[in-house]
Amino acid sequence: MKRILAAFMLLVCMTGCAAQPQGYTADFFAMDTFMSITAYGENEQAAQDTAVQLEQRINALEPALSRTREDSDLYRLNHADGAVCEVSEDTYAAIEAAVQYAEWTGGAFDPTMAPLTDLWGINTDNAHIPAQAEIDAALAHVGYQNIELLGDNQVRLLNGAQLDLGGIGKGFATDAAAALLDGSASVLATLGGNIGAYGENPNRDSGNWVVGIADP
């Protein structure tokens, strides 16, 4: 009886001492918002390496997606006056994805809304409601059909169109970062209002990630 009890206690001890995934959270500011990446690995260093790798990937994407940075592809493209511009692979992929979303939604999503964004002063200290005549004038330059994807990372904007990828930027960055994962890591990424959950949730027996939506 004592041997059985001892074996049982040993089994309980071994179960309790089983290695649990270790987590590491990287908090940082990018793309004009706060972001957080929590990664889990076999030890804290592995988790930290994963989180830092994803953070670096996201930071590297900012020049590809920003339209306000003068050193960015979008800034050059928006100020090219209809000339063909060569952009990075990341920028081209983001524009290509934006065009696909525009086509899928029949234009309900449109990445050429930059003239209207500027007109309304969104994300500035001069936000206001413009006159209808101003809106109509800006709309004359809006339309995803004004984007020409010419291949080999070559892009041209027609009819005075300008790109604003803010509508998909953080989601695109989430997917691009997730593409680096090899399937062994578990990651919860919060990029502004965009959330990506990958692998198994080590904090739940089911391994599932639970998402709640307030006031859907």
Explain the meaning of each model-derived region.
Residues 4-216:
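Mature catalytic core of soluble alpha/beta enzymes
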